[in-house]
């Protein structure tokens, strides 16, 4: 079976060298998820020859859309007309149809000429032509002396191929936000390593791993590594911190742990699921205090999203079922300030005895 894969739009406008790198990465990712017998690149298309199930392509980032297609050789336009008529005369019976022609190369006919002639050959068998809302849409993509013919276009995940933009450490609580922040960074081509402060025992861990299994379906066959840090030990160390700044200090500990892990595994950023002013610790002032003197980029892909939008995305991605079962363990104080004082937070942090190297060294590491 021949599958046409169309590249996500922004890949096509990159420099020739960058585009080649992205195409190579995408092809490798495709080979990770479906059985490909042969692959080639044809003027903006990746052409796959496969006998396997191709539906998994819908979750491969870097793909705009894909179609199973027939490939035909021709010497004259009538060859294409005859093929399309033989294949689709029965399929258009009683239906409104449309012909979509795209053409690359030099021919003695235009795309419009081809569409008219092909459409005329099918018209007697159909209920007529409807270019706005056809019941069946037949595509003919013409190259020099061959053409791709198909009637199904499946949506891809778009974005950039996994592994093309570097690695990020995701602070992954397992609630609604962090899985979607992870997914959005994956969509931008990032490899992800997850850091979880295990606050809810084995129940918490199981839900997190269930979510990671869902995210793995979008990860182009690559494994996702999760570091489970002893969160209870961290909370115990915060016992002497004033309640109204305790969450901010906890977040700083999380950031610093993630920063250290990033240095250890050559990641270039830290990603969080924070959304501006969604909760008290996520006001602009508190975010400033939280990331003060953190020397690595902090990405917040959900910063402008509201909770309803995040939950809707979780349904699309597939993590909703598991996220809805997990309490927000980071809500450790109901009286948190919305405007933490930087000097007070830094002074309180000095009193907290955290061995960051030890936290990471003693973390349980699970690969999904």
Curated annotation (Swiss-Prot):
Coiled-coil ranges per UniProt: none
Q: Which GO terms describe its biological process?
A: thiamine biosynthetic process; thiamine diphosphate biosynthetic process; thiazole biosynthetic process; tRNA 4-thiouridine biosynthesis
Pfam families, sorted: ThiI, ThiI_fer, THUMP
Give me the residues that bind ATP, please.
Answer: 171-172, 196-197, 251, 273, 282
List UniProt keywords, sorted A-Z.
ATP-binding, Cytoplasm, Nucleotide-binding, RNA-binding, Thiamine biosynthesis, Transferase, tRNA-binding
- Gene3D superfamilies, sorted: 3.30.2130.30, HUPs
Pathways involved: Cofactor biosynthesis; thiamine diphosphate biosynthesis
Keyword presence, tRNA-binding? yes
Database matches in PROSITE patterns: THUMP (PS51165)
Task: Name the chemical reaction catalysed here.
Answer: [ThiI sulfur-carrier protein]-S-sulfanyl-L-cysteine + a uridine in tRNA + 2 reduced [2Fe-2S]-[ferredoxin] + ATP + H(+) = [ThiI sulfur-carrier protein]-L-cysteine + a 4-thiouridine in tRNA + 2 oxidized [2Fe-2S]-[ferredoxin] + AMP + diphosphate; [ThiS sulfur-carrier protein]-C-terminal Gly-Gly-AMP + S-sulfanyl-L-cysteinyl-[cysteine desulfurase] + AH2 = [ThiS sulfur-carrier protein]-C-terminal-Gly-aminoethanethioate + L-cysteinyl-[cysteine desulfurase] + A + AMP + 2 H(+)
Q: What class of enzyme is it?
A: transferase
**Which molecular-function annotation in GO is an example for this chain?**
ATP binding
Which residues belong to any copy of the THUMP domain?
Answer: 51-153
Q: Name one GO cellular component term.
A: cytosol
What family does the Swiss-Prot or TrEMBL record give for this protein?
Belongs to the ThiI family.
NCBIfam families, per database record:
tRNA uracil 4-sulfurtransferase ThiI
**This protein's name:** Probable tRNA sulfurtransferase
Question: From which lineage does this chain's organism come?
Answer: Archaea, Thermoproteota, Thermoprotei, Sulfolobales, Sulfolobaceae
